[in-house]
């Protein structure tokens, strides 16, 4: 398992493979062409040959949650376009991110001057609309990676995915707003039925909704709520998703990948 940052993965990748070991990367350091992302709950298509050392990427936590939900939805609709807004916990940045949020919160509550360190501005009691640097078109690397991982996990490389990743002032647990444009009118009852039956998904009853801190943190399930059609377009479906980014999105999936490789 490599979860110590992209630089560590790149530095030791060849040494690991030369030793006859397979590598499970949680740092998103390797291109998906070299280390395809795998979500065992969706099957093992795309997994490299297990008879030799290989590199496998554990998908980003948001991709795990999104792909699980979309795989269930594909039983009753055909996605034509995805709009995804991911509000990510500060633990996305690792231990330093958790420490930064705790420190900023303490400084503000004690009326002390705020000095951002790990991030470039105030994140406590705030929402940051960008994570990392952006390219010439305004897209962050994490957003592009998220879109490509969802496409690969669904086996739909041409599926348009518009992703926005924001940094939220919570320690653990990601929240996602997912919009799905289908090729025809959507049967909401059928959607609810497949979500209720899907492995790894907990559908919250109508009139209620899940939260990351109140429902998802510490759980192995992906929570889904606020399932509804578009206001004026019966081909559009909107959902709210909450998931534990560390437990479900990273650790559990990495262990499940390892079980396939052993």
Regions found by a protein language model. Give the residues of each.
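N-terminal Rossmann-like NAD(P) cofactor-binding subdomain of oxidoreductases
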Residues: 1-121, 158-160, 222-223, 227-232, ...
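Short, flexible micro-motifs
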Residues: 8, 176, 252
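Secondary-structure boundary/capping motif
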Residues: 65, 138, 187, 249-250
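C-terminal substrate-binding/catalytic lobe of Rossmann-fold NAD(P)-dependent oxidoreductases
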Residues: 81, 86-238
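Glycine-rich phosphate/pyrophosphate-binding beta-alpha loops
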Residues: 167-169, 244-248
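Extended alpha-helical regions
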Residues: 216-223, 248-251, 260-262
């Amino acid at each position: 398992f490599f979860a110590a940052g992209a630089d560590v993965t790149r530095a030791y990748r060849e040494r690991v493979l030369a030793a006859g070991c397979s590598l499970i990367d949680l740092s998103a350091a390797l291109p998906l062409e070299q280390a395809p992302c795998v979500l065992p709950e969706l099957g093992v298509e795309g997994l490299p040959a297990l008879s030799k050392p290989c590199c496998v990427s554990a998908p980003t936590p948001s991709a795990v949650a999104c792909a699980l939900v979309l795989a269930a939805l594909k039983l009753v609709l055909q996605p034509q376009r995805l709009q995804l807004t991911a509000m990510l916990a500060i633990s996305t940045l690792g231990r330093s991110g958790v420490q930064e949020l705790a420190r900023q919160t303490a400084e503000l509550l004690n009326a002390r001057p705020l000095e951002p360190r790990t991030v470039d501005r105030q994140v406590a009691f705030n929402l940051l609309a960008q994570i990392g640097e952006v390219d010439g078109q305004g897209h962050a690397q994490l957003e592009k990676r998220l879109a490509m991982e969802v496409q690969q996990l669904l086996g739909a490389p041409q599926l348009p995915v518009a992703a926005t990743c924001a940094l939220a002032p919570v320690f653990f647990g990601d929240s996602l707003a997912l919009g799905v444009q289908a090729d025809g009118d959507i049967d909401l009852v059928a959607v609810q039925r497949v979500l209720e039956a899907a492995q790894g998904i907990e559908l919250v009853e109508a009139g209620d909704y899940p939260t990351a801190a109140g429902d998802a943190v510490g759980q192995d399930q992906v929570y889904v709520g606020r399932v509804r059609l578009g206001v004026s377009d019966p081909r559009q479906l909107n959902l709210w998703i909450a998931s534990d980014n560390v437990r479900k999105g990273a650790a559990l999936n990495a262990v499940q990948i390892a079980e396939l490789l052993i």
